[in-house]
């Protein structure tokens, strides 16, 4: 049976790497259930969702296509790691920015130390996070390159390239967590900034990037929509502006 799957006869349970967080956990859970049901709509399977004590989304799958559905969910969302192995790449999310490291949760907590953040430029972790608009709960990809007395981790080239593409862009980006796309669109519309943005990029389930137009300042968008959203926000100032 595939890792991440537990089951008994006629039902399979899958714990995913989708973290349920924020003040409105019920809303986030319902949103994820609706999203997954839509993704599995062509399969014969009944979907139920619950939250584990560690705040991961767990799916109970029942039906003719339950195993196919389980494999899809593991591929789509990943499963929490129970240990870190050298040479492996893991999906996870940003948890916090300490004095000497980015803290990442891959199912277990790992640290990306300051010396592994050189690719983002000079500065302390909190300064680097601010420069690239990074906030807690953003999905990330890390590589474990050593496991001895402690686990040594770095961000993958793919991850670093994404952040640098934001920084080198000709427009600002506003990074938002704990909000749906429709909530962000509504906040932008109600504050009269509909013509000031190009699009809203999806980063995760409730994590998005608002792509500003060339003459729009990201901090101004944050000041306008911030009071309407129960979110943390980061701003990436495009260097090519």
Regions found by a protein language model. Give the residues of each.
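OB-fold/S1-family RNA-binding modules
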Residues: 5-74, 132-241
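Ser/Thr-Pro-rich, acidic low-complexity intrinsically disordered regions of eukaryotic RNA-binding
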Residues: 29-30, 101-103
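Short, acidic/hydrophobic/Gly-rich beta-strand patch recurrent on exposed beta strands
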Residues: 60-62, 103-109
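Short boundary/loop segments of OB/S1/cold-shock single-stranded nucleic-acid-binding domains
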Residues: 67-89, 129-131
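Structural detector for short beta-strands of small beta-barrel domains
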Residues: 84-100, 140-142
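Short, structured patches in soluble enzyme cores that scaffold and shape functional sites
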Residues: 96, 106, 116, 144-146
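Beta-strand/loop nucleic-acid-binding surfaces
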Residues: 109-133
